[in-house]
Amino acid sequence: MFCSIYKSTKKQGAYLYIEKKDDFAPVPQELMAMFGTPTMVMVVNLEGRKLASVDVEKVKAAIKENGFFLQLPPPPENLLEKYKKR
């Protein structure tokens, strides 16, 4: 399965995976408004590939079910809480 990956212009670290290049029809308008203008990153074959931050099987399942996958950045690390637990 090939997919196109776009990064957000409004939320750093957010990426949108869609099946067909420049076909944002499956993505809800509210999400597109929050995502901003998508910037193309790459087209990738998901078969037999590992992704850096997400499980490739979850990406493929979401694209098949919803037509897209939204990758959000991990939550910021709370260093104060880590320090308190020492």
From Swiss-Prot:
InterPro entries xrefs: YcgL-like_sf (IPR038068), YcgL_dom (IPR027354)
One Pfam family hit: YcgL
Domain YcgL, chain residue ranges per copy: 1-84
Organism superkingdom: Bacteria
HAMAP family listed in its UniProt record: UPF0745
PANTHER family: PROTEIN YCGL
Protein known as: YcgL domain-containing protein VF_1703
Species: Aliivibrio fischeri (strain ATCC 700601 / ES114)
